[in-house]
Amino acid sequence: SVEAAKKIGAKSVTIHSNALGDGGVVVNHYDDLSDTVKLCSMYDMLLECAKMAEKEGVNMNLEALNITTDHVGNFLKYTQVGAEICRLINSSRLNVLYDVYHMQLNEGCICDTITNYVDRIGHVHVADAPGRHEPGTGEINYKKVIRHLEACGYQGFVGYELFPMTDTAAAVKAIIA
């Protein structure tokens, strides 16, 4: 992914603990491996990838995914685990992609989590929960979340990764509102 990003001029890539197939389905759950083995393998792989990312000048954003609705069987499901791995590897090119939708489903406490890990958040994804629709259609107070990101000093990108409740134009209007 890092080499492909460099080739096309992309500045960052999103990475996951498990390969995802069509519709975001986890390809292999690795049920035969313990969580300790999975964690150590992920650390070793990310350490090598971080070296490559540093050499190529590409940022990698490690995304935890919800395991209740969209990505059953995904290993990385909590911000804390991803952020602590990033802290241990200590590369400016490896950070967490904090997906508010996924983390609302897995762990809640969005503002507390942002406060605790803002130093390792490299990108933010936005969609409301439940449903993964535009802000204002679910239970997340996005005005509060965005204000909190700003108050914590987050200066990175915020991307909208969602399924419009009606159509794209209406979703864009809701996002701007």
Where in the sequence are the language-model features?
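Substrate-binding cleft and catalytic face of glycoside hydrolase catalytic domains
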Residues: 14-25, 61, 67, 74
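Surface-exposed, active-site-proximal loop segments in enzymatic domains
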Residues: 19-38, 174
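Histidine-acidic metal/acid-base catalytic patches
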Residues: 3, 9-11, 24-26, 59, ...
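Glycine-rich "substrate-gating" loop/helix at the edge of Rossmann-like oxidoreductase active sites
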Residues: 38-39, 71-73, 105
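An active-site-proximal structural segment forming one wall of the substrate-binding cleft
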Residues: 1-12, 16, 37-56
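A short, mixed-charge helix-start or loop-turn motif at secondary-structure junctions
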Residues: 28-35, 64, 68, 127-128
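Catalytic cores of phosphodiester-bond-cleaving enzymes
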Residues: 22, 41, 50-69
